[in-house]
From Swiss-Prot:
Residues holding pyruvate: T45, I204
Keywords on record: Amino-acid biosynthesis, Cytoplasm, Diaminopimelate biosynthesis, Lyase, Lysine biosynthesis, Schiff base
Coiled coil ranges: none
Function: Catalyzes the condensation of (S)-aspartate-beta-semialdehyde [(S)-ASA] and pyruvate to 4-hydroxy-tetrahydrodipicolinate (HTPA).
Classification via NCBIfam families: dapA (TIGR00674)
Organism the protein comes from: Nitratidesulfovibrio vulgaris (strain ATCC 29579 / DSM 644 / CCUG 34227 / NCIMB 8303 / VKM B-1760 / Hildenborough) (Desulfovibrio vulgaris)
Cellular-component GO terms for this entry: cytosol
Record keyword Transferase present: no
A GO MF label: 4-hydroxy-tetrahydrodipicolinate synthase activity
Quaternary structure (record): Homotetramer; dimer of dimers.
SMART domains found in the cross-reference section: DHDPS
Name of the protein in question: 4-hydroxy-tetrahydrodipicolinate synthase
Catalytic activity: L-aspartate 4-semialdehyde + pyruvate = (2S,4S)-4-hydroxy-2,3,4,5-tetrahydrodipicolinate + H2O + H(+)
Enzyme Commission numbers on file: 4.3.3.7
Length: 292
C-alpha cells in the first residue's frame, strides 16, 4: 500500500458532547469530492486524546464505512501503552483500515531501544502497514533516523514515517538511511513542498481539512513536474497554514470549519474556544483566501 499525496488528518465533529456521526460522514464525502488522496481519523487533529476507547473505534469504523475503499484510510492507533496500541491497531485492521498511524510513545520518554521494541511488539501481533508518527513537540521524544532505518530493515510492517519536526536535515537523513522506497510524509503543513523536493511522498495535513483541493493539487502538481504550479499553491497555502496554528491544533481548524458551516464549534476540554482576537484574525485570513 502506497500512502502518497495529501491525506487529511480529519477532525472529529462533536454535537452535545457526542461524536456527530452525520457531520463526520458529510465531511468525509466533501473531502473525497474535493480530491483528497487519503484520510487519517483519530489523529491529533481528531482529538484522539479525549476520545473514549469506544468512540475511537466508532470513528475509525465510520470513516472506513463511509470511504468504501475509494481512498486509503490510515487509522490513528497509537498509544504510550504498548498493549493498548496493539489492541487499537488490531481493531483498525479488523475494521478495514488500509494502515495504522502509530505515534511514538509520549510522556514515558523511552530510549531509542524502547521505541524500537514498542513497534516490534505491535508488528509481532498485528500485520498491517504502519506509518510511525514522529512529533517530538508533543511526545517529548524524537525517533532518530537510525532507529527508523533499523525498523525499516527488520520489520516489514513499518513502511514510512509522518515526520512532524519540520526538520529537513532529519528528513534527508531518513531517506538516506532508509532508501527512497520508505514513505516519508510531512506532518508539518509549512514544509510540504520542501519535503517533496528531497524525496518525500506527501503530507498528513491539518490545513487540508479546510482546503483539501488546494493541498492535494499542490502534491499532484509536484508529482507531475509542474513546479511553477506547486510553488504558487505553496505560497497560497502559507497564510492558511499560519491561521491553522494561531492556537493549539485543532482549535483553529475546528473554528474554521464551523465558520464554513461544516461542523458545530465544539471541542473537548482541556481544549477551549479560540481567543476573540484570534477569531478575528482567522476570519480575515479565511475571507482573504476566498474560503468565507
Amino acid at each position: 500500500m502506497q500512502f502518497t499525496g495529501a491525506f487529511t488528518a480529519i477532525v472529529t465533529p462533536f454535537r452535545n458532547g457526542r461524536v456527530d456521526e452525520e457531520r463526520f460522514r458529510e465531511l468525509i464525502e466533501w473531502q473525497i469530492e474535493q480530491g483528497i488522496n487519503g484520510l487519517v481519523p483519530c489523529g491529533t487533529t481528531g482529538e484522539s486524546a479525549t476520545l473514549s476507547h469506544d468512540e475511537h473505534r466508532d470513528v475509525i469504523r465510520i470513516c472506513v464505512e463511509q470511504v468504501k475503499g475509494r481512498i486509503p484510510v490510515l487509522a490513528g492507533a497509537g498509544s504510550n501503552n504498548t498493549r493498548e496500541a496493539i489492541d487499537l491497531t488490531r481493531f483498525a485492521k479488523e475494521a478495514g483500515a488500509d494502515g495504522a498511524l502509530l505515534i511514538t510513545p509520549y510522556y514515558n520518554k523511552p530510549t531509542q531501544e524502547g521505541l524500537y521494541l514498542h513497534f516490534k511488539a505491535i508488528a509481532s501481533e498485528v500485520s498491517m502497514p504502519f506509518i510511525v508518527y514522529n512529533v517530538p513537540s508533543r511526545t517529548g521524544t524524537n525517533i532518530c533516523p537510525e532507529t527508523l532505518a533499523r525498523l525499516n530493515r527488520d520489520i516489514p510492517e513499518v513502511v514510512g514515517v509522518k515526520e512532524a519536526t519540520g526538520n529537513l536535515i532529519q528528513v534527508s537523513e531518513i531517506l538516506e538511511y532508509c532508501g527512497t522506497d520508505f514513505q516519508v510524509l510531512s506532518g508539518d503543513d509549512f514544509t510540504v513542498l520542501p519535503l517533496l523536493s528531497v524525496g518525500g511522498c506527501g503530507v498528513i495535513s491539518v490545513t487540508s481539512n479546510v482546503v483539501p483541493a488546494k493541498m492535494s493539487d499542490m502534491c499532484r502538481a509536484f508529482k507531475a513536474g509542474d513546479l511553477a504550479t506547486a510553488r504558487r499553491l505553496h505560497f497560497e497555502l502559507s497564510p492558511i497554514n499560519r491561521a491553522m496554528f494561531l492556537e493549539t491544533n485543532p482549535i483553529p481548524v475546528k473554528t474554521a470549519l464551523a465558520l464554513m458551516g461544516r461542523i458545530d464549534l465544539e471541542m473537548r476540554l482541556p481544549l477551549c474556544p479560540l481567543q476573540q482576537v484570534n477569531q478575528s484574525r482567522l476570519r480575515d485570513i479565511l475571507a482573504a483566501a476566498g474560503i468565507l
